[in-house]
């Protein structure tokens, strides 16, 4: 499936806030691996509304991808609550909150060329950014 737009819906704008969409391929183990796409320009999150990158990216059938969003500010974007997402598991045998989001701390605007997945450091029970895409 080819897409020509990917972006986020800003619900609370913050002056000078910016962000970028990222797409990672999965490794043979099914965890995030190499970076396939990093938005080439900052998305301006200083006003509300849909902000998008124009791109040419094709998702290949039968492959797993991880789509995310990195940002350099505190603007609020539309998100999907963690309880509405597929769970990766629980943090412990007594935990009630499913781990449903993968996250990594990076220095904006850089995204690592390899995600370097570590379950203990990257799994979280929280909302995930809602990245919207348009089919080309």
Q: Where in this protein do the model-derived segments appear?
A:
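Short, surface-exposed beta-strand/loop patches at domain edges
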Residues: 70-136
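Intrinsic-disorder/low-complexity regions
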Residues: 3, 41-43, 109, 117
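Aromatic- and Gly/Pro-enriched, solvent-exposed loop/edge beta-strand patches characteristic
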Residues: 15-99
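A short beta-strand element within beta-rich, extracytoplasmic domains
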Residues: 1-13, 67
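Surface-exposed receptor/substrate recognition regions of extracellular proteins
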Residues: 1-2, 17, 103-105
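Intrinsically disordered, low-complexity regions of eukaryotic proteins
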Residues: 11, 44-46, 120
């Amino acid at each position: 499936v080819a897409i020509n737009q990917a972006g986020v819906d800003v619900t609370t704008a913050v002056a000078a806030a910016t962000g970028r969409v990222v797409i990672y391929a999965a490794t043979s183990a099914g965890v995030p691996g190499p970076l396939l796409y990093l938005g080439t320009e900052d998305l301006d999150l200083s006003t509300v509304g849909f902000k998008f990158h124009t791109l040419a990216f094709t998702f290949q059938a039968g492959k797993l991808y991880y789509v995310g969003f990195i940002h350099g500010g505190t603007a609020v974007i539309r998100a999907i609550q963690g309880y509405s997402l597929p769970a990766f598991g629980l943090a412990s045998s007594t935990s009630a909150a499913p781990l449903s989001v993968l996250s990594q701390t990076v220095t904006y605007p850089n995204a690592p060329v390899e995600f370097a997945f570590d379950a203990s450091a990257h799994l979280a029970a929280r909302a995930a950014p809602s990245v919207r895409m348009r089919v080309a």
